[in-house]
Amino acid sequence: MNPNKRKGDKAEREAAEVLTKVTGFECKRNLAAGIPDDVGDIYGIPNCGVQVCDYKDKNRACLVKPREVETQRKNAGVDFVASMVRFRGGEWRVVLTPEQFNTLLQAALQ
């Protein structure tokens, strides 16, 4: 296994643990991630897809992954998506486009 794949798998496992702890939903890695019709890296949160990223270039991760996860949202047929970006020291941030944030906000205000 190449080092980038190993790093990505580790980040996905860690993200699933973080999301399980924070949300109370049992979140797991989607082992079919990265294939055509990709539906995201993590499943277990109802009506939501999650993309995980541990790029060295965090700026790139924050710009690219939220756009990519939009395609995964359509593939999965879910209403909500988020990108989780790992920072040094195991710190995580959830990144959304303004449109993704608005979708979440409008649902919360219902």
Placement of each model-derived feature along the sequence:
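Catalytic phosphate/metal-binding cores of nucleic-acid and nucleotide-processing enzymes, i.e., regions
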Residues: 1-110
